[in-house]
A protein has these predicted regions:
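Short, solvent-exposed coil/turn segments at beta-strand boundaries
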Residues: 34, 108-109, 163-164, 218-222
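ATP/nucleoside-binding phosphotransfer catalytic cores, i.e., glycine-rich phosphate-binding loops
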Residues: 173-229
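Gly/Ser/Thr-rich beta-alpha loop segments that engage phosphate groups in nucleotides
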Residues: 44-47, 69-71, 118, 207
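Short hydrophobic alpha-helical segments that form membrane-spanning helices or hydrophobic packing faces
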Residues: 49-52, 74-76, 212
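Catalytic core of DAGKc-family lipid kinases
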Residues: 2-8, 13-14, 56-188
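Short glycine/serine/threonine-biased micro-segments
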Residues: 40-41, 114, 203
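N-terminal glycine-/serine-/threonine-rich phosphate-binding loop
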Residues: 1-62
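Short strand-turn-strand beta-turns centered on an Asx-Gly dipeptide
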Residues: 17, 107, 203-205
């Protein structure tokens, strides 16, 4: 019987062997290679962190997404099916189709679609500051952050695009190779000198701290995401 690993949510389905763990336990799961499918319950940041751990473990499994975040960019890009439809198909012995999703390294970090220290970083910082009360869940905090920052973005974006210390990578815009400090395609190693040994960087909606002044961004691998039940 195939083994399925569910991260961050307890799941049960007749005919399937599903083991549940928390995201923080992934690096220490015994016999991780025995799991053919990994269900990621969460948003884009959760996906990024799980893929980073799997990359370190050098384990490739088919990824099943159960998007519960605010944006769910990866899930929307691949139009992933409902989780219950997927589990039903697997329990019936069907072999669902998958699609490839590239991911990239930024020094020791991993990201799938977005990285930068421009308006994206400012937006995430402010949106997370608003994450309380009625704004805790949903997209309202992100919309408010855009409205609050719009005047700053309009004034500062042209200058940031011309700066060697600023950058923004958005992989889905692959038709644009490079425009100023904006990158839409990562096919080779990109080296960026931030001239600062302590930097906050936005990666797929997460804010991480990078303690190097030189950033090296490069293709790091691919994952297979289940796309049809």
């Amino acid at each position: 019987m195939m083994r399925i690993l569910s991260i961050n949510k307890t799941l049960h389905h007749d005919g399937l062997s599903i083991t549940t763990i928390q995201e923080s336990e992934l690096a220490t799961v015994p016999n991780i290679t025995e799991y053919s499918y990994i269900i990621i319950n969460g948003g884009d940041g959760t996906i990024r962190r799980v893929i980073k751990t799997l990359h370190t473990l050098e384990h490739t499994a088919i990824i099943i997404l159960n998007p519960t975040g605010s944006f769910n960019v990866i899930a929307k890009l691949h139009r992933v099916p409902k989780l219950q439809q997927v589990l039903l198909s697997l329990s019936q012995g069907k072999s669902p189709k998958t699609t490839r999703q590239s991911y990239y390294s930024l020094n020791e970090e991993i990201f799938l679609f977005s990285a930068g220290n421009m308006g994206d970083l400012q937006h995430i910082f402010l949106a997370e500051t608003l994450r309380f009360g009625i704004l805790k869940n949903g997209m309202a905090k992100y919309v408010l952050a855009v409205l609050f920052l719009l005047p700053v973005h309009l004034i500062m974006t042209p200058f940031m695009l011309l700066s060697k210390r600023k950058f923004f990578i958005f992989a889905p815009a692959g038709f644009i190779k490079k425009f100023g400090s904006f990158y839409g395609k990562v096919t080779d190693t990109i080296e960026i000198d931030l001239d600062n040994g302590y930097n906050h960087i936005e990666l797929d909606g997460d804010v991480v701290t990078v303690r190097q002044s030189i950033l090296k961004v490069a293709p790091a691998g691919t994952i297979h995401i289940l796309t049809t039940p």
